[in-house]
From Swiss-Prot:
Induction: Constitutively expressed, may be repressed at 45 degrees Celsius (at protein level). Positively regulated by MarA, Rob and SoxS transcriptional regulators. Belongs to the AcrZ family. This is Multidrug efflux pump accessory protein AcrZ. Disruption phenotype: Becomes sensitive to some antibiotics (chloramphenicol, puromycin and tetracycline) but not to others (erythromycin, rifampicin and fusidic acid). One of its GO terms (cellular component) is cell outer membrane. Part of the AcrA-AcrB-AcrZ-TolC efflux pump, interacts directly with AcrB. Keywords: Antibiotic resistance, Cell inner membrane, Cell membrane, Membrane, Stress response, Transmembrane, Transmembrane helix, Transport. The chain crosses the membrane at residues 8-28. It is a single-pass membrane protein. It is found in: Cell inner membrane. Residues 1-7 are periplasmic. GO terms for biological process: response to antibiotic; xenobiotic detoxification by transmembrane export across the plasma membrane. AcrA-AcrB-AcrZ-TolC is a drug efflux protein complex with a broad substrate specificity. This protein binds to AcrB and is required for efflux of some but not all substrates, suggesting it may influence the specificity of drug export. The gene is acrZ. It comes from Escherichia coli (strain K12).
Length: 49
């Protein structure tokens, strides 16, 4: 019974942690792509996007 409780607590703790890591990675990748697209736009002054 104690092992079951331990695994349950571990799962409850890990789920938000893993979700936070995934969201952080998505946000970080978005920031990186924004930086790269900003650099690309600076290299091409003829476009108005």
């Amino acid at each position: 019974m104690l092992e079951l409780l331990k695994s349950l607590v571990f799962a409850v703790i890990m789920v938000p942690v893993v979700m936070a890591i995934i969201l952080g990675l998505i946000y970080g990748l978005g920031e990186v792509f924004n930086i790269f697209s900003g650099v690309g736009k600076k290299d091409q002054p003829g476009q108005n996007h």
